[in-house]
Amino acid sequence: MDQFQHIDVQGAQALLEQSEAKLVDIRDPQSFAVAHAESAFHLTNDSIVSFMNDVEFEQPILVMCYHGISSQGAAQYLVNQGFEQVYSVDGGFEAWQRAELPIVRS
């Protein structure tokens, strides 16, 4: 069975800059509303169907959570749905913030 891959926040940012990669944030709505990575799509149970309809299976998908734990399960789920290049962002949003990468705040 295919597996997701791990990627650090710098690698994730580089992939976003040089490809058609999509960044999805699976944190709770309140956390996402307060602050999230620039260009992040809030992936929830309610938005998963529209996301899967809008994204090509060949597009790289980066999955972000709080610390890089929950994103692994979500990344594997996306692999199981047929997405070919899925990455779990190690360290999650916390690492993204620590690395001072682009963030949108409410």
Swiss-Prot record:
GO terms for biological process: glycerol metabolic process. Its main location: cytoplasm. Signal peptide: none annotated. GO terms for molecular function: thiosulfate-cyanide sulfurtransferase activity. It comes from the Bacteria. Its EC number is 2.8.1.1. The keyword Cell division does not apply. Transmembrane segments: none annotated. The keyword Transferase applies. InterPro entries: GlpE_sulfurtransferase, Rhodanese-like_dom, Rhodanese-like_dom_sf, Thiosulf_sulfurTrfase. It catalyses: thiosulfate + hydrogen cyanide = thiocyanate + sulfite + 2 H(+); thiosulfate + [thioredoxin]-dithiol = [thioredoxin]-disulfide + hydrogen sulfide + sulfite + 2 H(+). Residues 17-105 form the Rhodanese domain. It is found in: Cytoplasm. Transferase that catalyzes the transfer of sulfur from thiosulfate to thiophilic acceptors such as cyanide or dithiols. May function in a CysM-independent thiosulfate assimilation pathway by catalyzing the conversion of thiosulfate to sulfite, which can then be used for L-cysteine biosynthesis. This is Thiosulfate sulfurtransferase GlpE. It comes from Vibrio campbellii (strain ATCC BAA-1116). The gene is glpE.
